[in-house]
Design a protein with these regions (language model features):
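Outer membrane beta-barrel
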Residues: 15-167, 172-179, 183-190
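Cleavable N-terminal export/targeting peptides
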Residues: 1-10
Length: 190
């Protein structure tokens, strides 16, 4: 009986250790204060976002990611899977940030301001909902992307085929958006 109990404990420990190695959980919340000096000011503390993230390593080449915003009723932000075919060639399928502009792909945690995107990025990438035709997409869409880094990370590319409808929205037509970017990093610190 003691030997069987030890084997069960060892087996359970192996499962727990494997899960710890393969699954990482993270999250953050951002709070702010809005000051308005208008005739009728609307000064207020507010919550900007409450984010939960999970990253799973299925195999050495295959991963999956999940991101959810609990603020204001909750909203699925990202859910996708990556598969690395070769060094420098990875395919992604799911809902993720559109590879359009440098700012759109930055996390709000890496930018100094809570409302962190320029007006042009908010409009063109659909981050803020300022484009009434495109709506509020949070800079995300559903689709497929090929991406990678080449020449010792000197060159980074991303090419995506997206629905073009935005966040959590099924395609409403048979047309797709083709989006991409090409980044050159001539110096390590740039």
């Amino acid at each position: 009986d003691t030997l069987v109990a030890q084997e069960k404990t060892t087996s359970l420990n192996q499962v727990v250790n494997t899960l710890k190695e393969r699954i990482s959980l993270a999250g953050y919340a951002q709070l702010g204060y809005t000051y308005d000096d208008a005739v009728k000011p609307d000064n207020t503390f507010d919550i900007k976002r409450i984010i939960f993230m999970a990253h799973g390593k299925i195999t050495k080449r295959w991963t999956c990611d999940f991101m959810y915003d609990f603020y204001n009723g909750g909203m699925l932000l990202e859910v996708y899977t990556d598969y690395q075919f070769l060094p420098g060639l990875t395919a992604r399928i799911g809902e993720f940030k559109v590879p359009y502009t440098i700012e759109n792909e930055l996390s709000p945690t890496t930018v100094e301001l809570i409302n962190c995107y320029s007006q042009s990025v908010c409009y063109l990438a659909g981050v803020s909902g300022s484009d009434k035709c495109y709506g509020m997409t949070s800079g995300r869409d559903i689709g497929m992307m090929l991406h990678g880094k080449l020449f010792h990370d000197f060159l980074q590319y991303k090419v995506a085929v997206m629905n073009g409808q935005g966040l959590n929205t099924k395609d409403k037509n048979s047309q797709k958006d083709v989006v991409g970017n090409l980044m050159v990093y001539p110096l390590e610190w740039l």
